[in-house]
C-alpha cells in the first residue's frame, strides 16, 4: 500500500512541475519582448537600430584604416615596447630594495 501512495505523490509532483514549467516558459517568452535596459520605445521606433548601423559602418572603416600602413607603425610599436620593458626591469630592482629593508626591520624587532 505504501508503494501506491508514493506513486500517487510522485505523479502529483510531476504534474505540478510540468505546469510550473509551462508557466516559466510563458513568462520567458513574454520577457523576450522587453529590453533589459528599458528602452522599449526607442527600439520600437527604430531609433536605436539606426544608431547601431552607423556605429557598425564606422567600425568597418576603422578596421580598413588599421590594415593600411601596418609596416611603418609596427616599428614604432616595437620601440615603445622595448622602452617599457626597460622600465619594468628598473621597477623590479626598486621592489627588491624595499623588500630588503622590510627584512632588516623584521630582524630588529
Swiss-Prot record:
Basic and acidic residues bias: start-end ranges: 9-35, 99-109
Stretches the record annotates as Disordered: 1-109
GO molecular function, one term: histone binding
Pfam family, one: Prothymosin
GO CC terms, sorted: nucleus
Keyword flag Nucleus: yes
Keyword line: Nucleus
Biased composition (Acidic residues): 41-81
GO biological process, one term: positive regulation of transcription by RNA polymerase II
Main location: nucleus
Function recorded in the entry: May have role in testicular activity.
Family: Belongs to the pro/parathymosin family.
Protein's UniProt name: Prothymosin alpha
Species of provenance: Pelophylax lessonae (Pool frog)
Taxonomic classification: Eukaryota, Metazoa, Chordata, Craniata, Vertebrata
